[in-house]
């Protein structure tokens, strides 16, 4: 079989298995009539078992595909890119943290202008009282998105699609796939996607657009780190626990609406501006191109 055709078939198979298994598992509690009112990754109810296992499908499927379809050198390199940072990784992590903090600031300034309450910062307050809470939030923050998804989305999927001359198209495609993969979350009352859809279905659909704009930032960090997946874990972590998570909770309904628009605009602006810098262009030139398929 032609290697290009083989790569395409493997890619399509990965997407079909990942999306269908996630949807099957995360819709199963509703099919079984289980109580999902408070279900989340950390709720410890029976429905959360299906919810959690469904959520790890991108990573689980991606790792299996790497083990099955990559050469031994490819497997070693995959693990190294996931767990061993380089200088670019550290720069990408700092840029990610800075971008997310600016997005929080802008979102809250707009929200306050619209009459919203101040942010609660309960997570930060808990850490200030007991620093051990830092590890609690770090644990749930890492497994609730970074580890459960990014070995697949940015590890395997981006590996298969990476083309230096088509990074914009690739990023938007991955972001769209990533967005629709979240479909079951619209039906779980404890998830912010459910809140958005209840406020306005259009707002719920804009979440997919926000995934596409976020994917532009993810790809930028991926390039800066010379295709390391390591810093992507932190970008996803920062978005989960800072932008709309425990560090700033509770936040107003106004904030939860405004943040969607701010994230889309600022992520897009970051991509447009940063990808025109000499720093990024040099990183792109140095980013390795490889294909480890057997």
What are the language-model segments listed below?
Residues 32, 156-164, 192, 246-247:
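Membrane-interfacial alpha-helical segments at the cytosolic side of multi-pass membrane proteins
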Residues 196-265:
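Functionally important transmembrane alpha-helices
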């Amino acid at each position: 079989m032609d290697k290009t055709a083989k790569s395409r078939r493997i890619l399509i198979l990965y997407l079909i298995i990942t999306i269908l298994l996630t949807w099957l598992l995360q819709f199963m509690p509703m099919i079984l009539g289980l109580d999902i009112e408070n279900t989340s990754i950390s709720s410890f109810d029976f429905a959360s078992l299906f919810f959690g296992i469904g959520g790890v499908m991108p990573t689980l499927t991606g790792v299996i595909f790497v083990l099955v379809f990559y050469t031994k050198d490819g497997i070693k390199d995959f693990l190294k890119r996931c767990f061993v940072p380089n200088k670019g990784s550290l720069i990408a992590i700092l840029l990610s943290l800075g971008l997310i903090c600016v997005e929080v600031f802008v979102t809250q300034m707009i929200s306050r202008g619209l009459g919203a309450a101040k942010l609660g910062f309960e997570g930060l307050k808990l850490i200030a009282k007991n620093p051990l809470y830092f590890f609690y939030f770090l644990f749930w923050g890492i497994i609730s998105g970074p580890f459960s998804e990014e070995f697949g989305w940015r590890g395997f999927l981006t590996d298969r699609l990476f083309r230096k001359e088509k990074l914009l198209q690739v990023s938007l495609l991955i972001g769209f796939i990533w967005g629709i993969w979240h479909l079951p979350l619209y039906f779980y009352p404890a998830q912010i996607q459910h809140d958005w859809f209840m406020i306005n279905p259009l707002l719920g659909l804009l979440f997919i657009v926000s995934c596409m704009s976020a994917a532009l930032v993810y790809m930028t960090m991926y390039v800066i780190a010379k295709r390391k997946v390591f810093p992507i874990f932190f970008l996803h972590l920062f978005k989960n626990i800072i932008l709309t998570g425990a560090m700033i909770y509770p936040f107003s309904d106004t904030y939860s609406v405004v943040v969607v628009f701010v994230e889309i605009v600022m992520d897009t602006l970051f991509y447009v501006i940063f990808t025109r810098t000499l720093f990024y262009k040099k990183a792109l030139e140095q980013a390795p191109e490889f294909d480890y398929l057997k």
